[in-house]
């Protein structure tokens, strides 16, 4: 009977094995117990420079059955059991066996060895040899079994596999009635009237994510389809249909396990296993494989080798749940394309698709499964581009414990894309039924998981770069426009849990994770305790919220389109630092917006609150200033500026209402200037003011009570000035007596590991000499020539240093040199007594080594004599030196000029005031480097100069400079030797005893940006002077960053954040300037300076100089030339030849002007020459 059954059904069974005719020298033959195929052992990972570490449970070697050696001969009669193809290339296109009908091409195993090439344009059905053996009806010999469990299925070990169907499978559908659909594009692939007889459609929707198989009647247009034999169509929110053959035969374009020999309608598991850098192209195929990897804990087959011979297997233990036996599994493939396919898995499984260390293009597919995940990227080096796919999922969960060594991931039950990889890109994908759309898991020291100590990110070739498995590069998530729909069938899905994005870090080193361009349609969970999360170009819509734990959170260039304040956004996120910049937050005008004042100093939370969605269409914010925490010296002036564009023509005046919580900055209403598109608030800080101010501006229609925008500026701190106390250089610790004198201030070398030193350093420090120059000053380069970093990446280097116990407030200044080791940013964190000052600040330079200066305040309320300073980096940022400033050491008052030396002046003027103007002068010989001009006038006349200067809106340098002081008083924080001798309160010896440390109140200050590289021979690069805090030594007007639409001073570094649990003190000391080269020997001027100007932004700054153009109507002088080039016209000067030039200066005012010309140093005497001209 059984024999008659097979004769009637005329089933053709063909065993395929494709291999090339040369042997592989790397293969080893393994002997197995009777009843099994022998095995071949090959290197699993084709990269020649990456070797196994032999510590992982994941095999670095791959074993596959030697089926060609054990193939049985064909039996006589109607049934062919096996064919072994010896050709290197094979195309399976059409199989027609004519007896009673046309039947399918059935396969047990298809093997492609390296070099082989297989193209299949028709469908394949798989059957089980174990079931066939149990029948034992035709051939008495039993077929050997696969000891590794690859079959039934396809095993590709190299070469290429091409599965391409002849017509598209997937169509969009519009519901016309409960039984009628309109499909697009028209189904025109099959001619004639056989469509209704030969085809069915499978409808995938949010009510039936596993699909309904329906019979069809199609009209003549091939667009209208009437369905029957399936549930009626409901109110579907999303629907896709796939055309499949009514019976699986040779015309079907698919791979299926639909038939088995034992029972015609019983499914068996089949899988496609791709490895060995096989080139894969699968298009227009229906993959109904029901892979064999369950959503349970892995339990692999195990080979028991002989203790005396590694090439003999004595026993095989079959596992109950082998990994990597999914419907489609691709590993170590540099070129894999899956397009317009339907991948269906109806039984509970781990995932229908797993990509492992491969480069995959995954486009326009339908994935429907009852599984833990739709797709898993499970090695960590995958590069996957998912676009326009529909992921249907009925979550199937198991409570398992993640095991890193077994790489047992993706079973959680409800993941769309589950990944261990940083390079997963999703664009316009649609998800139906998931609990977590994107679930990323980053594990530390992946070598214990992958079997390899080094990684090579796909695509990976023999000559590709490899990196240590313990290194996690910065991660950029590109998750563009995802769409999500819940399952409407309550019997299939009854969970209220839904997360758009989940990221976990399992002990990784500090790293940066950036989510780019995401439209947030649901919650985001970030469990990245030691990491930096950036939301960039981010749009938050309905159901958005943010949960988890990060070390630093930045929201940049984003829009929150639901009523949330900054506090609402971050209330469920634990973070040390939060920054919200150039981002729009919707908040109704009838509700009050709470200003966040309890954040750390380094947090920049400056959202643009808008009252109504229509506001975005009427006003566009361009920039604000300040856009980072600003420090100003008391007694100075500066401007607060907001720039915006009016898109809508308002009938009434637009006003800006500035308010402050500190009387240092007065409340004021300012009209919007339609010419400059700005509201400018001039601020003049009193001479005795000190403290921090939080400033807010409301943009309003003058006749309306509702606001249009509310914007909070970064904190503005008014400072007083302290002076230099002590300095240390991280020079050779063996030269403890080595000293550096910079601008008269003494830096002592030799931080020791000894405990009795005034400067001790932890033993994990790595001393590095001969660091590259990062400034144009020889003295500073000498100070910065050596540095320390950690021996182990991101392990803190701790320095214990003495501090003035008699000073309540001190300042600490740290100088770092960054020498990049690759193109990726390095993260710098700084702590004082275990409290964060600077958190994960990214430093990156594409132009070589750069300089970083950090200054922060320390409140020594317990009169400590020593403090601990710690910093962490990945090993390419070096601390070169540090300085401490004390609040109870004051500047020496400037020398009062002798009034008898002042020349005679007209009777109506009893004071001679000096106005300084600087001109750029070009020459290759010693020439005049600046011209200083003075003029006489009454204070009331001088006011017009001050008001004109205030209108220079974005000037941040000049506001920090004082008036009515002598030019010799540079307000520097590093004292001269004379000043140090006169400062009697500095102790001669600092007590070495370390008292119990307390948690201080701290506030960091961002100082200057990295200096230009030395090879850049611009006037800026040749300037040896550093600017003060928040100042730009070259450009006076801040530059608008077009990418972020934020006004930034040119080259200003980003703000570094700090711990949120520490309040900011009400007062702060000044940020001391960097040490400068020794000052010139200029004699004190005998006239007080009223104000000073320079006439070019390319000219280096003289003290307290403002920028004024030569053509400015407020400029009382006219010059015959702007540049003195001594007629050289760019040529080099001849040695020992004298050159001359002249400058004609005309006074067009009624006041008397005093002119002083300052010349560069004399090369012989070392003195600075100057020449005094008469009044004119």
From Swiss-Prot:
Topology Extracellular: residue spans: 26-913
Region (Disordered): 965-985, 1050-1080
Topological type in the membrane: Single-pass type I membrane protein
InterPro entries (alphabetical): GDT_regulator, STKINASEGDT
Gene: gdt5
Cellular component terms per the entry's GO annotation: membrane
The name this protein goes by in its record: Growth-differentiation transition protein 5
Major location category of this protein: membrane
Membrane-spanning segments: 914-934
Keywords: Membrane, Signal, Transmembrane, Transmembrane helix
GO biological process, one term: regulation of developmental process
Biased composition (Pro residues): 1067-1078
Protein family according to the UniProt entry: Belongs to the GDT family.
PANTHER family, per database record: GROWTH-DIFFERENTIATION TRANSITION PROTEIN 5-RELATED (PTHR47774:SF1)
Cytoplasmic-side segments: 935-1176
Bias (Low complexity) ranges: 965-974, 1053-1066
Signal peptide location: 1-25
Record's subcellular location: Membrane
